[in-house]
UniProtKB/Swiss-Prot annotation:
It is found in: Membrane. It comes from the Eukaryota. Residues 52-64 have a biased composition (Low complexity). This is Calcium-dependent protein kinase 5. It holds the Pfam family EF-hand_7. It comes from Oryza sativa subsp. japonica (Rice).
Length: 549
C-alpha cells in the first residue's frame, strides 16, 4: 500500500465475491467442499474457548488488496509489532466468532480482570506475505491509536503478538450496522439523515485534521456501539487508511464501486475522496439507492466518471433544496472545488439546529435500502451453491488448469505458483496485480487458493455464463421442487449457510416481477445476472486470456 505516487492497483473489487462463497463460509479442497466449521477452526488462535454469549458485533472484512514488493523477511513476520507484548490469554478469554476479514478473524473476547466484553481481531501472521502486508498491520494499529479518543471512532484497547497471530483488542460494537438500524426503526427523516451525516463527516474531519485518509468509508464500516442509541455510531476498519501530508497524491485504487470517487479511478487523489464517499452515503440515506448506478461494474465506473446526479426521480421532488445543494457540493467531480469535511459540517442543512426537515421520508426509501442490502446476500449465497455443485464433467478444463498451476501437487496454489502459471498462460500482469487476484480468490484466507476457491473464482468472474449453473442453484433453493422459491425456502437456505434471514420478504419483492409472492426460474436468472457484485479491472478469467467454459 503506497503513500507515494507509485502506480499500484489495490481494489476491493472482490469484497463482494469473497462474500459470495464467504463472509462466514469457507470451502475446502477436493471437488467437494469441507464444512465451514472445519475450515474456520483451522484458522482459530490456539486456546480459543467454545462459543459463548450472545452479544452481536461485526468486523467488516478487510478489502482484497494488492501488495507491492518482495516477500516479507522472516524477522519481520516473527516480530510484526516491533516490540514484545504480554500474552493475550493472560488478559482476555476469546469467545465466539464475530466476523471474518481478509487477514484474520474477529472474536468476542472478555477482559479477565473486569469481565468487560471487547472485540478481538486476530490476524494470521502466515498471511502477511510481503513487507507491505506487515507495514499495513502496523499502520492500522498506529492509526487506531492516533485517532484514539474520538467518540465516533472505535477505541483500540491494545495489541498483542504471539508466534502465529497479531491480536487487536478493541471496543465491541454490539448495535449492528448503520443501515440495518435505519430499517429497524421503520421511520426516517431528513433531520435524522443530517444527524448521521454530521457524525460520519465529523469522523472524516478528525481523520483529515490528524493527517489520515480513511479510504474505505461505506455503511458497513459504521457500526452502532449501542443498539438503543442511533447516534452511537463508530467508524471501524482502518485497514486501508493511510497517513498523508498536504499535497500528497495517492494512486492506489481502493474502495467499492458505488462509493469510489472519480479521482480514485483516475489514480490521482487525496483526502477529498473521503468527502465524495460521504456524499454517496448521504444520497443513499435520503433515497435508498446509490447515485451512480448501472447494470455492470464498468457502467458504474462510467457513471461515476460522468458525475450526473439524478434529482428528478422519487423521492427527490420532495427532498429539501438544501439537502440537494449539499449533495451536489459533496459530489463535485473536481476535488479541489469539492467541500472540505469542515465546510460540510458548516452547511446549513447539516449543522446543529439546521434546516433539515423533520418530516418522515417516503416509506419506499426504507424499502429500497432493505433491498439494496439484502439482495447481494442472496446472490452471494447462490454463488457458493453454484461453485459447490459443479460436476467433474463441467469443470474438467478448469481442473486441468488448477493441476497445471499446482506444481507441487499440494492441493493448493501458492502465490509463486499462481504467478508462474499466469505467465505460462500468456498473462502480462504485474506482480502486484497477480497478488490482487490471489487475495481475491482466497476466500478462506488461507494464503493459498484451493480447488473450490479456484472454481468459485472463475465461475463468478465468468458472470455465470452457463445456464446449468443457474439451474443447479435454483434447484438448491427450490427445496420442494415446485418451480418456485418461497420465503420459507430462503430462510432454510440461510440457516444452512449461517446467514441472517432478515428482510427476505424484500428479496422476494425485488425479484418477483409478476407479484405472485415467490421467485420463478426466469426471475431468479434475471436477479442473478443483473449488475455485478465486484469491482475491479482484472479478473482471473480475462487475466488468463482463455476460455473458462
Amino acid at each position: 500500500m503506497g503513500n507515494t505516487c507509485g502506480v499500484t492497483l489495490r481494489s476491493k473489487y472482490f469484497a463482494s465475491f469473497r462474500g459470495a462463497s464467504q463472509r462466514h463460509d469457507e470451502a475446502g479442497y477436493a471437488p467437494v467442499a469441507t464444512s465451514a466449521a472445519a475450515a474456520a477452526a483451522a484458522d482459530e488462535p490456539a486456546g480459543k474457548k467454545a462459543p459463548r454469549g450472545s452479544a452481536a458485533a461485526a468486523d467488516a472484512p478487510h478489502a482484497a488488496s494488492m501488495k507491492r514488493g518482495a516477500p516479507a523477511p522472516a524477522e519481520l513476520t516473527a516480530n510484526v509489532l516491533g516490540h514484545p507484548t504480554p500474552s493475550l490469554s493472560e488478559h482476555y478469554a476469546l469467545g465466539r466468532k464475530l466476523g471474518q476479514g481478509q487477514f484474520g478473524t474477529t472474536y468476542l473476547c472478555t477482559d479477565l480482570a473486569t469481565g468487560v466484553d471487547y472485540a478481538c481481531k486476530s490476524i494470521a501472521k502466515r498471511k502477511l506475505i510481503t513487507k507491505e502486508d506487515v507495514e499495513d498491520v502496523r499502520r492500522e494499529i498506529q492509526i487506531m491509536h492516533h485517532l484514539a479518543g474520538h467518540r465516533n471512532v472505535v477505541a483500540i484497547k491494545g495489541a498483542y503478538e504471539d508466534p502465529q497471530y497479531v491480536h487487536i483488542v478493541m471496543e465491541l460494537c454490539a448495535g449492528g450496522e448503520l443501515f440495518d438500524r435505519i430499517i429497524e426503526r421503520g421511520q426516517f427523516s431528513e433531520r435524522k439523515a443530517a444527524e448521521l451525516t454530521r457524525i460520519i463527516v465529523g469522523v472524516i474531519e478528525a481523520c483529515h485534521s490528524l493527517g489520515v485518509i480513511h479510504r474505505d468509508l461505506k455503511p458497513e464500516n459504521f457500526l452502532l456501539a449501542n443498539k438503543d442509541d442511533d447516534l452511537s455510531l463508530k467508524a471501524i476498519d482502518f485497514g486501508l487508511s493511510v497517513f498523508f501530508k498536504p499535497g500528497q497524491v495517492f494512486t492506489d485504487v481502493v474502495g467499492s464501486p458505488y462509493y469510489v470517487a472519480p479521482e480514485v479511478l483516475r489514480k490521482c487523489y487525496g483526502p477529498e475522496a473521503d468527502v465524495w464517499t460521504a456524499g454517496v452515503i448521504l444520497y443513499i440515506l435520503l433515497s435508498g439507492v446509490p447515485p451512480f448506478w448501472a447494470e455492470t461494474q464498468q457502467g458504474i465506473f462510467d457513471a461515476v466518471l460522468k458525475g450526473v446526479i439524478d434529482f428528478d426521480s422519487d423521492p427527490w421532488p420532495v427532498i429539501s433544496d438544501s439537502a440537494k445543494d449539499l449533495i451536489r457540493r459533496m459530489l463535485n467531480p473536481r476535488p479541489k472545488e469539492r467541500l472540505t469535511a469542515h465546510e460540510v459540517l458548516c452547511h446549513p442543512w447539516i449543522c446543529d439546529h439546521g434546516v433539515a426537515p423533520d418530516r418522515p421520508l417516503d416509506p419506499a426509501v426504507l424499502s429500497r435500502i432493505k433491498q439494496f442490502s439484502a439482495m447481494n446476500k442472496l446472490k452471494k449465497m447462490a454463488l457458493r451453491v453454484i461453485a459447490e455443485s459443479l460436476s467433474e464433467e463441467e469443470i474438467a478444463g478448469l481442473k486441468e488448469m488448477f493441476k497445471a498451476m499446482d506444481t507441487d501437487n499440494s492441493g493448493a496454489i501458492t502465490y509463486d505458483e499462481l504467478k508462474e502459471g499466469m505467465r505460462k498462460y500468456g498473462s502480462t500482469l504485474k506482480d502486484t496485480e497477480i497478488r490482487d487476484l490471489m487475495e481475491a480468490a482466497d476466500v478462506d484466507n488461507s494464503g493459498t487458493i484451493d480447488y473450490i476457491e479456484f472454481i468459485a473464482a472463475t465461475l463468478h468472474l465468468n458472470k455465470l455464463e452457463r445456464e446449468e449453473h443457474l439451474v443447479a442453484a435454483f434447484s438448491y433453493f427450490d427445496k420442494d421442487g415446485s418451480g418456485y422459491i418461497t420465503v420459507d425456502e430462503l430462510q432454510q437456505a440461510c440457516k444452512e449457510h449461517n446467514m441472517p434471514d432478515a428482510f427476505l420478504d424484500d428479496v422476494i419483492k425485488e425479484a418477483d416481477q409478476d407479484n405472485d409472492g415467490r421467485i420463478d426460474y426466469g426471475e431468479f436468472v434475471a436477479m442473478m445476472t443483473k449488475g455485478n457484485m465486484g469491482v475491479g479491472r482484472r479478473t482471473m478469467r480475462n487475466s488468463l486470456n482463455i476460455s473458462m467454459r
